């Protein structure tokens, strides 16, 4: 029927869009993709239309009796819920760390406002790792010290690199850039304690 054909077409469009967004993200960065694709009204509407059609098909055809189809449509709805949680409740930004300077907040990407962190973080040192025998950078590594809420006298040490994410209190820190003098470090901050987990559950 027309509804099924429309659902298939929208599925194909969504998959193609997500694939294209992956390449765009590699070329222009995560902030660009989120601002121009993931966090736009038309993208949310696309997800909403697909979810609505899938839900109608699920009810009208009693698809809950066919477990594989139920699992497929159910996972789609779970992914949509996770995406909406991320859209409405997540925070993203960046923090600039300097050696020996304690930071307790980060700057939000969209609003430019300072948002508090539930803990403090300090850069101990930053270094660039090179491929053996070359001057080609292999990794950027920030060595940090942080303290947990209510435990300021308890200092914990961690390192953040291109392939190593630091997670604490629902905040995820990614190594993104560094100062020209090679001393300061820039970290991307992502706060999404529920949305990411719900979305991953849908894919599983």
What is the role of each PLM region?
Residues 3-204:
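Solvent-exposed, non-transmembrane regions of integral membrane proteins
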């Amino acid at each position: 029927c027309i509804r099924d054909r429309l659902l298939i077409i929208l599925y194909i469009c969504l998959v193609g869009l997500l694939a294209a967004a992956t390449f765009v993200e590699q070329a222009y960065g995560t902030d660009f993709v989120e601002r121009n694709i993931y966090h736009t009204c038309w993208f949310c509407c696309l997800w909403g239309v697909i979810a609505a059609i899938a839900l109608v098909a699920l009810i009208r055809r009693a698809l809950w009796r066919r477990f594989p189809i139920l699992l497929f449509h159910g996972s789609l709805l779970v992914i949509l819920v996770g995406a909406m949680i991320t859209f409405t409740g997540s925070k993203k930004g960046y923090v600039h760390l300097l050696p020996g300077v304690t930071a307790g907040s980060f700057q939000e990407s969209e609003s430019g406002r300072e948002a508090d962190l539930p803990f403090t973080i300090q850069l101990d040192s930053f270094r660039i790792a090179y491929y053996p025998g070359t001057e080609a950078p292999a990794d950027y590594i920030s060595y940090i010290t942080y303290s947990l809420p209510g435990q300021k006298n308890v200092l914990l040490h961690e390192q953040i690199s291109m392939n190593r994410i630091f997670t604490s209190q629902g905040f995820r820190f990614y190594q993104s850039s560094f100062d020209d003098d090679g001393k300061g470090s820039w970290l991307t901050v992502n706060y999404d304690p529920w949305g990411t987990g719900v979305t991953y559950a849908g894919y599983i």
